[in-house]
Amino acid sequence: MTQTIFMVGARGAGKTTVGSALALALGYQFIDTDLFMQQTTQMSVAEMVEQEGWLGFRRRESIALQTVTQPSTVVATGGGAILAEENRRFMRQHGKVIYLRSPAEVLAQRLEEYPQDTQRPTLTGRPIAEEMLEVLAAREALYQEAAHYVMDGTGGPQQVVEQILSALQLETVK
């Protein structure tokens, strides 16, 4: 299998952590679309949003997603990449989409434990626990629609990687 693997899920779901470990296990390249955009623009996500608004940021995110997609690559997407129907369709057509699903309280706890990883500005202006509840409620159906596989993201990174590898292996056997 050399298909691109796309990691989707909310902020704090572990897309970057699990995605990089998965890439290592598969011998794939790993790319995080947020980091790619930061490197190519020399701006943080917050600066991009401040300068271009969320609409401009999302447009840039769609271009980045298509730019980094290549065989034998694991791509960690931004939490909102699935908001654009074009992105959901693109990912499903060009690879396998893995949704790392975790409850809002787990996501909030992770984001509070690792505040440096929360480089995105708040979406709602509310406390992180409330924001995660609201974001998941709004996006859950879109994550599900995009996903080929829905994985429990509450375990440790290696445990989640093993679950993903098992799911992908079962598919190649069919």
UniProtKB/Swiss-Prot annotation:
<dbReference type="InterPro" id="IPR023000">
    <property type="entry name" value="Shikimate_kinase_CS"/>
</dbReference>
<comment type="subunit">
    <text>Monomer.</text>
</comment>
<dbReference type="InterPro" id="IPR031322">
    <property type="entry name" value="Shikimate/glucono_kinase"/>
</dbReference>
<feature type="binding site">
    <location>
        <position position="58"/>
    </location>
    <ligand>
        <name>substrate</name>
    </ligand>
</feature>
<dbReference type="GO" id="GO:0000287">
    <property type="term" value="F:magnesium ion binding"/>
</dbReference>
<dbReference type="GO" id="GO:0005524">
    <property type="term" value="F:ATP binding"/>
</dbReference>
<keyword id="KW-0460">Magnesium</keyword>
<feature type="binding site">
    <location>
        <position position="32"/>
    </location>
    <ligand>
        <name>Mg(2+)</name>
    </ligand>
</feature>
<keyword id="KW-0808">Transferase</keyword>
<dbReference type="InterPro" id="IPR027417">
    <property type="entry name" value="P-loop_NTPase"/>
</dbReference>
<keyword id="KW-0028">Amino-acid biosynthesis</keyword>
<feature type="binding site">
    <location>
        <position position="34"/>
    </location>
    <ligand>
        <name>substrate</name>
    </ligand>
</feature>
<dbReference type="GO" id="GO:0005829">
    <property type="term" value="C:cytosol"/>
</dbReference>
<keyword id="KW-0067">ATP-binding</keyword>
<feature type="binding site">
    <location>
        <position position="79"/>
    </location>
    <ligand>
        <name>substrate</name>
    </ligand>
</feature>
<dbReference type="GO" id="GO:0004765">
    <property type="term" value="F:shikimate kinase activity"/>
</dbReference>
<keyword id="KW-0547">Nucleotide-binding</keyword>
<feature type="binding site">
    <location>
        <position position="16"/>
    </location>
    <ligand>
        <name>Mg(2+)</name>
    </ligand>
</feature>
<dbReference type="GO" id="GO:0009073">
    <property type="term" value="P:aromatic amino acid family biosynthetic process"/>
</dbReference>
<dbReference type="GO" id="GO:0009423">
    <property type="term" value="P:chorismate biosynthetic process"/>
</dbReference>
<dbReference type="GO" id="GO:0008652">
    <property type="term" value="P:amino acid biosynthetic process"/>
</dbReference>
<feature type="region of interest" description="LID domain">
    <location>
        <begin position="112"/>
        <end position="126"/>
    </location>
</feature>
<dbReference type="Pfam" id="PF01202">
    <property type="entry name" value="SKI"/>
</dbReference>
<keyword id="KW-0479">Metal-binding</keyword>
<feature type="binding site">
    <location>
        <position position="139"/>
    </location>
    <ligand>
        <name>substrate</name>
    </ligand>
</feature>
<keyword id="KW-0057">Aromatic amino acid biosynthesis</keyword>
<comment type="similarity">
    <text>Belongs to the shikimate kinase family. AroL subfamily.</text>
</comment>
<feature type="binding site">
    <location>
        <position position="120"/>
    </location>
    <ligand>
        <name>ATP</name>
    </ligand>
</feature>
<comment type="function">
    <text>Catalyzes the specific phosphorylation of the 3-hydroxyl group of shikimic acid using ATP as a cosubstrate.</text>
</comment>
<feature type="binding site">
    <location>
        <begin position="12"/>
        <end position="17"/>
    </location>
    <ligand>
        <name>ATP</name>
    </ligand>
</feature>
<dbReference type="InterPro" id="IPR027544">
    <property type="entry name" value="Shikimate_kinase_2"/>
</dbReference>
<keyword id="KW-0963">Cytoplasm</keyword>
<dbReference type="InterPro" id="IPR000623">
    <property type="entry name" value="Shikimate_kinase/TSH1"/>
</dbReference>
<protein>
    <recommendedName>
        <fullName>Shikimate kinase 2</fullName>
        <ecNumber>2.7.1.71</ecNumber>
    </recommendedName>
</protein>
<keyword id="KW-0418">Kinase</keyword>
<comment type="pathway">
    <text>Metabolic intermediate biosynthesis; chorismate biosynthesis; chorismate from D-erythrose 4-phosphate and phosphoenolpyruvate: step 5/7.</text>
</comment>
